[in-house]
């Protein structure tokens, strides 16, 4: 289970979302599987489907784990392609006629299909018996339909994250 936090009109500090209203929140179901090419999980394929009341997407990726650890720690580098249905594409990047009038942005309707290619680096390390620290850097290059939406500022998205994982 996951939660899509939606988008609030006030999320943009420079007013780029003014007139678009809030994009709805929703719950999602996430199904994921990985296939290892060897016993050490050095090279793997990853498939993920995310679906919910705000739309669906699928991700297909491949990655490599670095280091000699066999406890889930260390570094991974992966590349992935994302496709989405039109419902999710328009929730995230579309502009309805009413939103166009209110915002002054061009009406934009997207179809489903290719969303992006991404490159992801992750690092995990134990800080004690049950806690791990987690770091992630992600670069996602949008496909033409998404990149052309007036909502996007550029043709890519970059994220950096740090977190903690409790291992039972």
Give the role of each language-model region.
Residues 38-42, 70-74, 126-130, 157, ...:
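Strand-connecting loop/turn motifs
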Residues 42-44, 74-80, 132-136, 161-163:
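Residue-level detector of the transmembrane beta-barrel scaffold of outer-membrane proteins
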């Amino acid at each position: 289970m996951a939660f899509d936090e939606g988008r609030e009109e006030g999320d943009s500090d420079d007013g780029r979302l003014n007139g678009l209203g809030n994009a709805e929140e929703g719950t999602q179901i996430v199904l994921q599987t990985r296939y290892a090419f060897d016993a050490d999980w050095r090279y793997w394929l990853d498939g993920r489907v995310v679906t919910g009341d705000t739309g669906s997407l699928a991700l297909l990726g491949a990655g490599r784990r670095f280091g000699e650890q066999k406890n889930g720690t260390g570094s991974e580098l992966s590349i992935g392609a994302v496709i989405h249905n039109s419902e999710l594409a328009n929730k995230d990047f579309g502009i309805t006629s009413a939103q166009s009038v209110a915002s002054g942005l061009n009406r934009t309707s997207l179809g489903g299909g290719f969303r992006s290619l991404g490159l992801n680096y992750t690092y995990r390390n134990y800080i004690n018996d049950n806690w791990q620290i987690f770091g992630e850097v992600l670069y996602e290059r949008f496909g033409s339909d998404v990149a052309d939406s007036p909502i996007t500022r550029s043709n890519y998205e970059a994220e950096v994250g740090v977190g903690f994982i409790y291992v039972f």
